[in-house]
């Protein structure tokens, strides 16, 4: 699993810290950090929540073209 650069960049564009995104999703900041580092594979429901908060699609954030 690689780093989720798209999610990190989208979060930054939205002006959210890891803690702010975590609070909106009801998860810990460590969970957001682990997803962005590629150390944690989130559930589909968490992926959908992240997409809703950031205003993007699953393809935008989680689809790997490689």
Task: Describe these PLM feature segments.
Residues 12, 23, 52:
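Alpha-helical residues within the helix-turn-helix
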Residues 30, 40, 59:
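Key DNA-contact positions within bacterial/archaeal DNA-binding proteins
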Residues 12, 26, 37, 66:
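Residue-level detection of the helix-turn-helix DNA-binding "recognition helix"
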Residues 1-13:
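A short, Lys/Arg-rich alpha-helix, primarily the initiator
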Residues 16-34:
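Short alpha-helical DNA-recognition segment
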Residues 45-60:
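DNA major-groove recognition helix of helix-turn-helix/homeodomain DNA-binding modules
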